[in-house]
Curated annotation (Swiss-Prot):
Extent of the signal sequence: none
Protein name: Protein NrdI
InterPro entries: Flavoprotein-like_sf (IPR029039), RNR_Ib_NrdI_bac (IPR020852), RNR_NrdI (IPR004465)
Family of this protein: Belongs to the NrdI family.
Pfam families per the UniProt record, alphabetical: Flavodoxin_NdrI
GO biological process: protein modification process
Length: 157
């Protein structure tokens, strides 16, 4: 795991309510898109075209790939489209957690977009997976998301 991950305590976490919902970005390779489809969870895709935008008005977990060159090079790790989406105060306010993907060939910067966003937004970094992910990753993430929402719904009753 990454050394710069901020520990988020339970008192810091605002758990989501409603039903599990994922907002994600996928490049033209569609790796993240194909992974999200396997989750079979309601979702919304951040547009690839930087001029386009979306707005979110409900709790969500962000899933993003990592763009990074490995080693100490983390500049540009968070895709520009994700930065633009999160620069919208309303979109940012509904983010409850983050999941990232990456390539283990890049060593310490594998999935580093997740910890960067987690630290910036003070939300939990929930999981990371490699490239297209595995069936195990799909199962783990579904379990994490449903538990996260269940806890949030129970706390607000």
């Amino acid at each position: 795991m990454h050394s710069n991950v901020k520990k988020v305590t339970d008192k810091d976490v605002i758990k989501p309510v409603g039903v599990p919902f994922v907002v994600y970005f996928s490049s033209i390779s569609n790796n993240t898109h194909r992974f999200i489809q396997k989750l079979e969870i309601e979702n919304l895709r951040i547009p690839y075209e930087i001029e386009q935008s979306i707005s979110v008005d409900r709790d969500y977990v962000l899933v993003t790939p990592t763009y990074s060159g490995g080693g100490e090079y983390v500049e540009g790790a968070v895709p520009k489209q994700v930065i633009k989406f999160l620069n919208n105060k309303q979109n940012r306010s509904f983010c409850r957690g983050v999941i990232s993907s990456g390539n283990t060939n890049f060593g310490d910067t594998f999935g580093i977009a997740g910890p960067i966003i987690s630290k910036k937004l003070n939300v939990p970094f929930l999981y990371q997976f490699e490239l297209l992910g595995t069936q195990h990753d799909v199962s783990q993430i579904k379990q994490i998301l449903f538990k996260f929402w269940e806890d949030g719904n129970n706390e607000r009753k």
